[in-house]
Amino acid sequence: MPEQVIELTAVRRDYPAEPPVRALDDVSLGVARGDYLAIVGPSGSGKSTLLNVLGLLDRPTSGSYRLDGIETTALRDGARTRLRGDRIGFVFQSFHLLAHRSVVENVMLAEIYGGHPRKGRRERALTALDRVGLSHRVNFLPDRLSGGERQRAAMARALMGGPSLLLCDEPTGNLDSRNTGAVLDLFDELREQGLTIVVITHEREVSTRAGRRVKITDGVLVEEA
């Protein structure tokens, strides 16, 4: 597999307005396999737009985006959807767990909606839950979990398809300091296992744990020391 998971080259994203709004301005970024990258920046800086482009939820106006060596910008919607389901896992600030479903059922839903084969689905979900240290909560409903455990369940769901890239949008925004630390420890473990992680955050505790940090301001990306 290619050494670079993410290769952005001169990416722009413009939105129609008067005058036009440039949310991303000639953004170039390379993220190698196994990297742990934090993206920081003020509100309205372009962080969410960048996440949407990286997650194949939005198309750049111009420029190139290669994911795992695949040029994505010219792909049709169906091909982009399949590539996203195969290569990208998402973790958000809100856990998006169904209250009436058990933890393992919530994790299994990732493959149901992704069109993956039914055979072995529960076993794969149990493996993902064990990977995030939640094997003792598989039959619990979400309301019996702590905030940190709910985020771990959401991370297990994101890991179900064996993604190359984990995209995290403010993953600790709803957690206290203890649960934040536990989630960050899990990120460290996943990185050691070779997973590529990109985290958008405004929390310094989160960004300082990453191996790399970039800042986006007015759509312009700058690498930080």
Mark where each language-model region is.
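ABC family nucleotide-binding domain
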Residues: 4-216
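Short, low-complexity, intrinsically disordered N-terminal peptides in bacterial proteins
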Residues: 1-3, 225
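H-loop (His-switch) and adjacent beta-strand-loop-beta switch element
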Residues: 213-225
